[in-house]
UniProtKB/Swiss-Prot annotation:
It comes from Methylocella silvestris (strain DSM 15510 / CIP 108128 / LMG 27833 / NCIMB 13906 / BL2). GO terms for molecular function: ATP binding; cysteine-tRNA ligase activity; zinc ion binding. GO terms for biological process: cysteinyl-tRNA aminoacylation. Monomer. This is Cysteine--tRNA ligase. Its cofactor is Zn(2+). GO terms for cellular component: cytosol. PANTHER family: CYSTEINE--TRNA LIGASE, CYTOPLASMIC, CYSTEINYL-TRNA SYNTHETASE. A motif ('KMSKS' region) lies at residues 269-273. A motif ('HIGH' region) lies at residues 31-41. HAMAP family: Cys_tRNA_synth (MF_00041). Zn(2+) binds at C29, C211, H236, E240. Belongs to the class-I aminoacyl-tRNA synthetase family.
Length: 449
């Protein structure tokens, strides 16, 4: 079986050959735990959980190390703790616990290691000292900064010309910087802020050095795959590469860099000002999106229907379609025993996590090999048990008829054919089906008692 992944560093799809097949090593940037995670963060969690599952399937579950960090020292954390009047550790512990609930709700496996930044100060200080000793970092007014010209091919990951990056960095450049692109490795901490003793005084780390330190501690100086959202390519991942390569002297930090695409909500960029900022916790536990709660399996399948590198429009309609698909699959597989995933399904995932093609293969298995359908869903991390219980009490033919009528009514509503919509509602009511048109546009249903 040959795995092929798109490498952001080379801008091409490449055959994947791990450094050590008995110890495949993956790092993905985890959350900064100051608030609930939004659904864009959820996409990253699902994508790299699927990668973890696929690698475990290919190399064995005991031969893959997946590290996903927790950033628990950050200016946003300090500000939120002060705003709420709570201790920083109380805030980060609370948000980490909610994050774990959300990740589990999306069907994500725990990573092999989940390091916290605050537990890796010694590693951060050690890397910074290496950079100073090698002339790649300098001390200025209590700060330690990375000297970007020390990295000749800085910008190789983002493919940004250096002049463009310099132009973008010229706004309010700190006077202690030698160059506008230089970035902070260590900075002084105010008495009211968290701080750690270092050779350069009491302070705290910059964001980028945290991931370099944690990946080094748990995966080594060079590892197989580094991942995250596309928004992290620059500056975060670019800076990680620069400081890690300069500290350890290797030509690469990770052999493959994988990034998932952007997410928008109902056709618009997600933002609090637009009122379309959607958190994972809200989707799983409240009726704030589409007027109802959504099972984690529905959220996961809705994400996986779009290839991970493509932008995705997260909509109520997409969730409804994913739920209908899962309901059909559950009825098709009722009474079947799980089997090994189908070879064509595995081939699809092996081709740069081609989930749209993999899902198409599952549709083909629905009638002829329901056990293989279950095996494929298990590998995708989609749990049919997440769905509600309403359709379990129905014969398959009755369930399919109900779903078809609901879909017809939805089409009538979209075309503002209210008479047809009412006719279909009445027909469903005669079958004992009660519809609820929720405030966000989603339609839910239940059987009359």
């Amino acid at each position: 079986m040959s795995l092929r992944f798109y490498n952001t560093l080379t801008r091409q799809k490449e055959a994947f050959t791990p450094i050590d097949p008995a110890d495949v090593r993956v790092y993905a940037c985890g959350p900064t735990v100051y608030d609930h995670l939004h659904i864009g963060n959820g996409r990253m969690l699902i994508v790299f959980d699927l990668l973890f599952r696929l690698l475990r399937h290919v190399y064995g579950k005991d031969h893959v190390r997946y590290v996903r960090n927790i950033t628990d020292v950050d200016d946003k954390i300090n500000a939120r703790a002060a705003e709420r009047g709570v201790d920083i550790r109380v805030l980060t512990d609370e948000m980490t616990a909610i994050f774990h609930e959300d990740a589990a709700g999306l069907g994500c496996l725990p990573p092999t290691v989940e390091p916290r930044a605050t537990e890796h100060m010694a590693e951060m200080i050690a890397i910074i000292q290496k950079l100073i000793d090698k002339g790649a970092a300098y001390i200025a007014e209590g700060h330690v900064l990375f000297d970007v010209p020390a990295m000749p091919d800085y910008g190789a990951l983002s493919k940004r010309p250096l002049d463009d990056m310099i132009a973008g960095a010229r706004v309010e450049v700190a006077p202690y910087k030698r160059g506008p692109m230089d970035f902070v490795l260590w900075k002084p901490a105010a008495p009211s802020e968290p701080g750690w003793e270092s050779p350069w005084g009491r302070g705290r780390p910059g964001w980028h050095i945290e991931c370099s330190a944690m990946s080094w501690r748990h995966l080594g100086e060079v590892f197989d795959i580094h991942g995250g959202g596309i928004d992290l390519v620059f500056p975060h991942h670019e800076n990680e590469i620069a400081q890690t390569r300069c500290a350890f002297g290797h030509s690469v930090m990770a052999h493959v860099w994988m990034h998932n695409g952007h997410l928008q909500v109902e056709g618009e960029k997600m933002s609090k000002s637009l009122g379309n900022f959607v958190t994972i916790h809200e989707l799983l536990n409240s009726d704030s999106f589409g007027g109802r709660k959504w099972p984690g399996a529905v959220l996961r399948l809705a994400m996986l229907r779009t290839h991970y590198r493509q932008p995705i429009d997260f909509t109520v309609k997409a969730l409804e379609e994913a739920e209908r698909t899962l309901s059909e699959w559950r009825h098709a597989a009722e009474g079947a025993e799980p089997e090994a995933p189908d070879a064509n399904f595995i081939d699809a995932l092996s081709d740069d996590l081609n989930t749209p093609r993999a899902i198409s293969e599952l549709h083909a298995l629905k009638a002829k090999r329901p056990g293989a359908l279950l095996g494929g869903l298990a590998l995708l991390g989609v749990d049919l048990a997440d769905l509600g219980e309403e359709e379990r009490a129905l014969p398959r033919s009755a369930f399919e008829q109900i779903m078809a009528l609901i879909a017809e009514r939805e089409a009538a509503r979209q075309h503002k054919n209210w008479a047809e919509s009412d006719r279909l509602r009445d027909k469903l009511a005669a079958m004992g089906v009660v519809l609820k048109d929720n405030k966000g546009g989603a339609t839910s249903w239940e059987l009359k008692p």
